[in-house]
Amino acid sequence: MIIGITASCFDLCHAGHLEMLKYCKKHCDYLIVMLQTDPSIDRPDTKRKPIETVFERYIRLKNCKWVDEIIPYDTEKDLENALKVLEYDIRFLGEEYENKNFTGRYIPGHLEKCHFNPRKHSFSSTNLIERIKSLKEKI
């Protein structure tokens, strides 16, 4: 059995999240989703606080047919520790991380397990928020 793992905040779950989860599950038998509670905890300059609670995001992921297990985590250090302890065969990351410094990159043997999935769309939580803001201004 091939075990895959991916990590994100999954705030305002949108089409891009679903395409990514579907892609991950297509390449593994069992998919573990690491759910970040709040990325602004240790990256306040680059990440925003989630709009949805971790429980709302958990419920949505729990009901997604491509997700087999959900593990919440708080910080990037928590994620790194999980990557060191959990057993998995493939870690899925977006292709935009391939040449970047990402959590877990320097764990011995980890980079060989990384699969950088293609992003063939422009869906994002940031774009969704901007669209909602522009609609609100028109009301």
Language-model features: locations:
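Nucleotidyltransferase catalytic core that binds NTPs
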Residues: 1-139
